[in-house]
């Protein structure tokens, strides 16, 4: 049972190490690089050792040897003309492209251009309690600020504020 727990931890740590490495390519300083800061926070919440985090940052920044992990986006068409945008982290583009092609082919799909049919949107979820506890701004003023900032859809549900916006 210890071996099973260790294997699960190892898989989680590997996942977070890849996320940290990819984020570190945009800059190795977490105070400036928000995506790196978020990846580090997620890794810490999973109790990933500090040495592993630092090694992943160095690998992403190019300070260590070994294969570079890259983020790739594939577009595919699946069964019943369903459309997919597939984001991958990989150290080998050719192997990943082959695997994606194979997976799509197994269900009668193929790689194809579908990105034109999607809009890139962001979603912000804010707890009303958290907003109130910080005493930064009242809810109504905050909602007005979001609308002024270009939020397209604002939904209040169960003390949670959801804001959707177009990234363009």
Q: What are these regions, as identified by a protein language model?
A:
Residues 1-29:
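Intrinsically disordered, Lys/Arg-rich N-terminal extensions and targeting peptides
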Residues 9-12, 16, 32-36, 49, ...:
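Helical mechanochemical/support elements of P-loop NTPase systems and associated helical scaffolds
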Residues 20, 47, 53, 100, ...:
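Residue-level signature of catalytic and energy-coupling elements of molecular machines
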Residues 32-85:
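Translation machinery proteins
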Residues 78-82, 91-94, 118-120, 157-159:
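Short flexible coil/turn linkers enriched for glycine and charged/polar residues
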Residues 84, 116-132, 161:
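Short glycine-/aliphatic-rich beta-strand segments at the starts of folded cytosolic domains
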Residues 89-93, 125-137, 165-168:
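Short, surface-exposed ligand-recognition loops at beta-strand->loop->(often short) alpha-helix junctions
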Residues 104-111, 148-153:
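A common structural junction motif
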